[in-house]
Amino acid sequence: MKVAVLGAAGGIGQALALLLKTQLPSGSELSLYDIAPVTPGVAVDLSHIPTAVKIKGFSGEDATPALEGADVVLISAGVARKPGMDRSDLFNVNAGIVKNLVQQIATTCPKACVGIITNPVNTTVAIAAEVLKKAGVYDKNKLFGVTTLDIIRSNTFVAELKGKLPTDVEVPVIGGHSGVTILPLLSQIPGVSFTEQEVADLTKRIQNAGTEVVEAKAGGGSATLSMGQAAARFGLSLVRALQGEKDVVECAYVEGDGQYARFFSQPLLLGKNGVEERKSIGKLSAFEQNALEGMLDTLKKDIALGEEFVNK
């Protein structure tokens, strides 16, 4: 099993690479790529960790050597949010980066499962899909927007509020991966109930958690370590499913049946070919139903922006 991390010299990429080096199954290969010249050194640094995961780093304009034979590609390349920016301000820079890298994937490892971490995910996933489609290699069961950070944040905040172990809480989060498009389904957590005020406050905190980190870092960055952990959780789940493990379920942002929007984050059963089954989002509370209906215009606009970027 070979996993490639593109954008591996950045804050998310390094955290992700560290977690993959320590947690990928024995015998896996990990390849790191970034435009930054430090990348081969990041791989050498990680290679000293005693796990049976082979690692190699590549830098420069061409990601091809890192992508050859990859089963899973995780893309975290791009610029990070600064205070006062929202995820859409990132679009102008990151759209071109994602387009370029996905073109290289289409040529070098078109059958790989691809996880997009680079923000704004609502839009960058649409860009990736259109690029793969143009190349004639698009498989909607193998392209994912990694929204796992919304899930782990939800788990943490709910556990804090309710005095539970974070590992005992699993909150499904649907929709997209920015602002109002992030919808935690707090009504679906077994054995936990909330007041209306708690639901409103928690939902808002989960939606704005990225800004919480950006402000706390006082201009020094955005959520990199928690995002690295979230991306590792998703990547490792995908690897386990590809290797044949059963009942691996994660939420991610994928192309579905278009019931709500072309791309939508929902619980997915993962399998040997990527998405095995798009699971139902279940019964929503009145609050959740309203929030879902209220986000769709925003989500559809985000998606259209990505489609137009490739097809203009």
From Swiss-Prot:
GO terms for cellular component: cytoplasm. Its EC number is 1.1.1.37. It catalyses: (S)-malate + NAD(+) = oxaloacetate + NADH + H(+). Substrate binds at residues 81, 87, 119, 153. This is Malate dehydrogenase. GO terms for molecular function: L-malate dehydrogenase (NAD+) activity. NAD(+) binds at residues 7-13, 34, 94, 117-119, 227. InterPro entries: L-lactate/malate_DH (IPR001557), Lactate/malate_DH_C (IPR022383), Lactate/malate_DH_N (IPR001236), Lactate_DH/Glyco_Ohase_4_C (IPR015955), Malate_DH_AS (IPR001252), Malate_DH_type1 (IPR010097), Malate_DH_type1_bac (IPR023958), NAD(P)-bd_dom_sf (IPR036291). One of its GO terms (biological process) is tricarboxylic acid cycle. Homodimer. Keywords: NAD, Oxidoreductase, Tricarboxylic acid cycle. Gene3D superfamilies: Lactate dehydrogenase/glycoside hydrolase, family 4, C-terminal, NAD(P)-binding Rossmann-like Domain. Belongs to the LDH/MDH superfamily. MDH type 1 family. Catalyzes the reversible oxidation of malate to oxaloacetate. The keyword Transcription regulation does not apply. It holds the Pfam family Ldh_1_C. The active site is at 177 (proton acceptor).
